[in-house]
């Protein structure tokens, strides 16, 4: 059976791994997933990720980040734009998520980026997910 929303599957795996206090989580790799992981790493929500090959299939292994107290660096990670209902936003309509403590991840004509970077470049796009 094929999956209809690979990004939502990745976000769910990350969320469940944090709830289970796992150190790593892996899932099938794709360009959009790796772009989202680049943003998460740049914003400091994950440690690192590595792309590996197994039986000619690419997998991404993500090293999750915890505080010294053992608390997860991601409290909430949710899909906003879904295959059945795409959500687009101009940059002026995006207000700070959790009083600028969280981020929106957007797919723009200039690539996948956080809302902070999109404000600097003054570009809107599809709101992929929100992270806090």
UniProtKB/Swiss-Prot annotation:
Please give the Pfam families that the UniProt record associates with this protein.
Answer: Ribosomal_S8
Ordered alphabetically, the record's keywords are:
Ribonucleoprotein, Ribosomal protein, RNA-binding, rRNA-binding
Q: Does the keyword Nucleotide-binding apply?
A: no
A single Gene Ontology CC term: ribosome
Q: Which GO terms describe its biological process?
A: translation
Q: Which GO terms describe its molecular function?
A: rRNA binding; structural constituent of ribosome
What InterPro entries does the annotation carry? Ribosomal_uS8, Ribosomal_uS8_CS, Ribosomal_uS8_sf
What does the record list as coiled-coil region(s)?
none
**What is this protein's function per UniProt?**
One of the primary rRNA binding proteins, it binds directly to 16S rRNA central domain where it helps coordinate assembly of the platform of the 30S subunit.
The similarity annotation says: Belongs to the universal ribosomal protein uS8 family.
Q: How does it assemble?
A: Part of the 30S ribosomal subunit. Contacts proteins S5 and S12.
Q: What is this protein called?
A: Small ribosomal subunit protein uS8
Its gene is rpsH
């Amino acid at each position: 059976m094929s999956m209809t929303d690979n990004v939502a599957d990745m976000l769910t795996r990350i969320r469940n791994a944090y709830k289970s206090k796992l150190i790593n989580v892996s899932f099938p790799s794709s360009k959009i997933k790796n772009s989202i992981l680049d943003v998460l790493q740049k914003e400091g929500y994950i440690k690192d990720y590595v792309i590996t090959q197994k039986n000619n299939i690419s997998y991404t292994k993500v090293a999750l980040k915890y505080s010294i107290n053992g608390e997860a660096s991601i409290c909430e990670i949710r899909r906003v734009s879904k295959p059945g209902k795409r959500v687009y936003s101009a940059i002026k309509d995006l207000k700070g998520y959790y009083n600028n403590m969280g981020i929106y991840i957007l797919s723009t004509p200039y690539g996948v980026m956080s809302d902070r970077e999109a404000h600097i470049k003054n570009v809107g796009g599809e709101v992929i997910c929100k992270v806090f």
